[in-house]
Amino acid sequence: MAQAAVERRVFRLSVDEETVVAAGVGALSEAPRAAGGTAYIVHEEALSAEAARLARILEARGVEVLGAVAGGGERVKSLDWVTRLWDLMLQAGVERSTTVYIIGGGALLDAAGFAASTLMRGLSTVNIPSTTLAAFDAAAGGKTGVNLRGKNMVGTFHNPRMVLVEPGIVAGQPDEGYRDGFAELVKHVALSGDREPAASLLPQALARRPAPLARLAFWSLGYKMQVVAGDPRERGLRRILNLGHTIGHALEAASSYTLSHGRSVSIGLAGELELSRRLAGLPRGEAEDVLDMLSTAGLPLEPPPGLAGEAAGLVGLDKKREGGSIVMPLLERLGRPRLSRVPVETVSRLMVELWGGG
């Protein structure tokens, strides 16, 4: 497949707020479009070369880069780290017009996005994902946050001005974790009912070919942003994006986060597809199509031995719980999700039935 040009789409979120999603080889060159005169760069520790490249692109267009700082991993999702970042940005001389460019995975996008959204009552951001999980999902949608007695308990909705998917940066992700993001891609396939992009491009994207990887990221982020544009603050429709996450989050927590988010969501999708078959009438063949995509991506469909029983006991702690039920998305058909109140006990029993009580 020939290298595709940079694809670009604008998503209007409100009268005065929009997010531009751009993906393709050369997407980084779009960065100056979002600059407000000065810039500050936050990047993963392993991406210093990419940060320097971004700085050269910005400076060549007359944008002053005030400074850069490295960080990454779940440790950045703390108020201590955010306080340090606030201090560094203030020392560098950021102003209300400064744009913060964030090159990294989901944890860094969350934490640095939160820092930018609160400093001076909100600085503009540009997200540049470095992982498949971020490129297919986390880089768009505007959720920021840090951990406090639980994951993402302190945060804001702060949509980036741009999301730039430079496939060479994403393709450089280490093998461990590269496949994880494909769980979120497959989730979007199930919710949208549009199987074509993944069916034709999945093997090439798994092989890290830049053009197919960028095309899938553009499609996946585009689907998510269509949903987000209709419900920016997650009061209704946007909650369909939690498909796979009720069971997935319980498994992640039960493993003390040794089971990655992407793998947890993959297993969660398998469980919630079965729940959709039983409670919403999802045809078996359509469920199997989704499971086949997860398997093609090399993702698990069941948890490690002994984990399901402990995870089943954690389902009731889900933030989506209302009384004795959880408001969660189920699929009537691929492309036809609905929000349903499912008793906590129903979800817990299903997990034990499918995977054992440990």
Swiss-Prot record:
GO terms for molecular function: 3-dehydroquinate synthase activity; metal ion binding; nucleotide binding. Binds 1 divalent metal cation per subunit. Can use either Co(2+) or Zn(2+). GO terms for cellular component: cytoplasm. It comes from the Archaea. NAD(+) binds at residues 72-77, 106-110, 130-131, 143, 151. Pfam families: DHQ_synthase, DHQS_C. CDD domains: DHQS (cd08195). Its EC number is 4.2.3.4. GO terms for biological process: amino acid biosynthetic process; aromatic amino acid family biosynthetic process; chorismate biosynthetic process. The keyword Phosphoprotein does not apply. Pathway: Metabolic intermediate biosynthesis; chorismate biosynthesis; chorismate from D-erythrose 4-phosphate and phosphoenolpyruvate: step 2/7. InterPro entries: Dehydroquinate_synthase, DHQ_synth_AroB, DHQ_synth_fam, DHQS/DOIS_N, DHQS_C. It catalyses: 7-phospho-2-dehydro-3-deoxy-D-arabino-heptonate = 3-dehydroquinate + phosphate. Zn(2+) binds at E184, H245, H261. The keyword Transmembrane helix does not apply. Keywords: Amino-acid biosynthesis, Aromatic amino acid biosynthesis, Cobalt, Cytoplasm, Lyase, Metal-binding, NAD, Nucleotide-binding, Zinc. Its cofactor is NAD(+); Co(2+); Zn(2+). It is found in: Cytoplasm. Belongs to the sugar phosphate cyclases superfamily. Dehydroquinate synthase family. Catalyzes the conversion of 3-deoxy-D-arabino-heptulosonate 7-phosphate (DAHP) to dehydroquinate (DHQ). This is 3-dehydroquinate synthase. It comes from Aeropyrum pernix (strain ATCC 700893 / DSM 11879 / JCM 9820 / NBRC 100138 / K1). The lineage of its organism: Archaea, Thermoproteota, Thermoprotei, Desulfurococcales, Desulfurococcaceae. The gene is aroB.
